[in-house]
Amino acid sequence: ADITANNNREWFLAHKEEYTACRASFEEGITKLITVISQFDPTIAHLTVKDCTYRFNRDTRFSPDKSPYKNHLGAYICMNGRKSLCGGYYIHIEKGHTLVAIGAYFLPTNILTACRNEIMGNIDEWRSRVENKAFVETFGTPNASKWGDENPKGFGLECLKTCPKDFPRDYEHMNYLKMKDYCAWIKVPDTFFEG
């Protein structure tokens, strides 16, 4: 049995030792990952595991789903920690739905507009990064797909249906401006972080 089938306080308290051991192992792995990533991205070298990991309890105040706990463990590794709007590295560990992601999502309008302007101003460099063979084979093309069993990889979680406000409607590479996030992800085996 796991938290997905038993998402209630009584079950959780009866299995708290298992959670504590699992959480400790997860945090140890994230600490190692920070060390590895900091070798090619020194902006995150100062982070601690607490800067990056999310709480296991859910905020249910405005949700119709009152399940008290998340079904996964997650960490966002970026220069300003898990609450940052900067791009970074996301780790999501959930039975049958483990994945790794890069980029940024849930961006406020002003930052999303700045990203779109930056892409337009540097479209050749942008395309050389997101249209190269290795990137496309790993993550795909902009597709606004939710992660799940049917989507083992993706580039972009949400896209606008039309041109964003104040951008030219006839822009040749509109698919990049319609993106509401710049997040690329790939599903990995649940055992990916073991060992």
Go through each PLM region and give its residues.
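Residue-level preference for alpha-helix termini and adjacent loops
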Residues: 10, 18, 55, 61, ...
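N-terminal start-of-chain detector that recognizes signal peptides
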Residues: 26-28, 46-49, 62-64, 153-158
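Short, charged low-complexity intrinsically disordered segments located at boundaries
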Residues: 27-33, 60-69, 146-149, 165-167, ...
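Active-site acidic/histidine clusters and adjacent loop/turn architecture
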Residues: 4-54
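Charged, low-complexity intrinsically disordered regions
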Residues: 87-195
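Hydrophobic/aromatic-rich structural module bridging two neighboring secondary-structure elements via a short loop
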Residues: 38-88
